[in-house]
Amino acid sequence: MSKKRGLSGEEKRTRMMEIFFETKDVFQLKDLEKLAPKEKGITAMSVKEVLQSLVDDGMVDCERIGTSNYYWAFPSKALHARKRKLEALNSQLSEGSQKHADLQKSIEKARVGRQETEERAMLAKELSSFRDQRQQLKAEVEKYRECDPQVVEEIREANKVAKEAANRWTDNIFAIKSWAKRKFGFEESKIDKNFGIPEDFDYID
């Protein structure tokens, strides 16, 4: 013979509410601990826990009078309490669904952007490596450049190009100064001062 299954927590809560609705009476805990096992099959040891859960959910009212707690519940209030509870649960469900949707979007966005992020990280790493290599090469070049004939020749050629360019600009400046003196009658010293041209400004030999 199979063992009889005990009541679930929700079944105990439902049967406890039936006691209040059917009797429309006010009870103390000790009264319910006697009545609930007999009328509804709720074990006396679980009455207090079930009762407290109903009080916490606003289904049952509790008032302390003197040294005793008194419990009661009316169908209309229980209905409103259930309605509020249902609304709260629906609200939580809606919020949960929205959070899930937002999270899903974030995941998809992260997936889309992951390749770019990885590529940027890889490029940044390569760039850093190239910079390090460049610094090392520059240091090596500095050590040997003074005794490298090719480097010396390149430096001479670069100096020659720079000298020619500087003298071309010198030509231009002298031409502008000459034009300004003829056109506006400016003194050469004032032109030099206004344009920051040094007194010893001349061609490079």
Swiss-Prot record:
Its Gene Ontology biological processes?
Answer: homologous chromosome pairing at meiosis; reciprocal meiotic recombination
What PANTHER family does its record include?
Answer: MEIOTIC NUCLEAR DIVISION PROTEIN 1 HOMOLOG
Q: Where in the cell is it found?
A: Nucleus
A GO molecular function term, named singly, is: double-stranded DNA binding
Under what name is this protein listed? Answer: Meiotic nuclear division protein 1 homolog
Q: What does this protein do?
A: Required for proper homologous chromosome pairing and efficient cross-over and intragenic recombination during meiosis. Stimulates both DMC1- and RAD51-mediated homologous strand assimilation, which is required for the resolution of meiotic double-strand breaks.
Question: What would be one Gene Ontology cellular-component term for the protein?
Answer: nucleus
Q: Which family does it belong to?
A: Belongs to the MND1 family.
Give the record's subunit note: Heterodimer with PSMC3IP/HOP2. MND1-PSMC3IP interacts with DMC1 and RAD51 and binds to ssDNA and dsDNA showing no preference for either form of DNA.
Under the heading InterPro entries, the entry gives: LZ3wCH, Mnd1, Mnd1_HTH, WH_DNA-bd_sf
Q: What is any Pfam family matched here?
A: LZ3wCH
Residues bearing N-acetylserine are: S2
Species of origin reads Mus musculus (Mouse)
Q: Which residues form a coiled coil?
A: 83-173
Alphabetically sorted, this entry's keywords are:
Acetylation, Coiled coil, DNA recombination, DNA-binding, Meiosis, Nucleus
